[in-house]
């Protein structure tokens, strides 16, 4: 697999109009919405995060969590909230990078033609569990932005677990599968792990990783 990145790929103008999104199928809305949530969460915990990017990411997490379910049901409010949320997430992560969830998702999409947002959504809870030991103290703010009830009264471990549970629930609510069963082939895991480790997003992950550890993450998603 070859990654192609060039400044000529970046548009000079982007028209973000929720009315133009009203014909999107539910599955596409769910997948792209969960990709946007992954942008915001990974951008918030990445090694390169800063005060300004944190501001964008937390607001994006709030907007996406509040509006993705409605967008999947094609409500005008949901579409508008998601249009704004995904745009704000892009303003954040494009300045600080992403992490292991995206690096693992890229290979899946290339090898199996799995929609990128679906791959991100399935891997995100696993990535959060993996990164909890080094970035778990930041999960409380993510959970708070997602509207997790009682999170201020929880200790850090409880808040992290509640945040991961909220991510899983949102993904399930919009129809995303919970694992890679039927998608991932065990014989491809070595290749995928090597590709993920070499991916441009991998160095931004808050926890340093290895090909062997990524292999175990893939295996856990079967």
Whereabouts are the PLM-identified features?
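Carboxylate- and glycine-rich phosphate/diphosphate-binding segment that chelates Mg2+/Mn2+
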Residues: 1-96
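C-terminal charged capping/lid subdomain of soluble metabolic enzymes
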Residues: 139, 149-222
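Short alpha-helical scaffolding segments that buttress acidic/His motifs in well-ordered protein cores
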Residues: 37-41, 82-90, 104, 124, ...
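A general structural signal for well-ordered alpha-helical segments in protein cores
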Residues: 34, 61, 101, 120-121, ...
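C-terminal catalytic subdomain
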Residues: 96-162, 168
């Amino acid at each position: 697999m070859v990654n192609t990145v060039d400044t000529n790929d970046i548009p000079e103008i982007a028209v973000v109009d929720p009315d133009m999104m009203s014909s999107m199928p539910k599955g596409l809305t769910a997948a792209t919405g969960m990709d946007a949530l992954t942008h915001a969460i990974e951008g918030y915990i990445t090694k390169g995060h800063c005060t300004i990017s944190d501001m964008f990411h937390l607001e994006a997490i709030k907007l996406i969590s509040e509006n993705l379910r409605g967008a999947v049901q094609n409500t005008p409010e949901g579409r508008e909230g998601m249009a704004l949320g995904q745009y704000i997430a892009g303003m954040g992560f494009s300045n600080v990078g992403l992490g292991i969830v995206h690096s693992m998702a890229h290979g899946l999409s290339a090898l199996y033609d799995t929609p990128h947002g679906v791959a991100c959504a399935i891997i995100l809870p696993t990535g959060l569990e993996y990164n909890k030991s080094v970035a778990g103290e930041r999960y409380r703010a993510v959970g708070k932005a997602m509207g997790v009830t009682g999170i201020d009264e929880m200790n850090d471990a409880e808040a992290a677990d509640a945040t991961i549970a909220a991510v899983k629930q949102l993904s399930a609510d919009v129809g995303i599968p919970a694992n890679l069963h039927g998608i991932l082939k065990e014989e491809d895991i070595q290749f995928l792990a090597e590709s993920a480790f070499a991916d441009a997003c991998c160095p931004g992950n808050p926890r340093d990783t290895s090909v062997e550890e990524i292999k175990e993450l893939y295996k856990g998603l079967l």
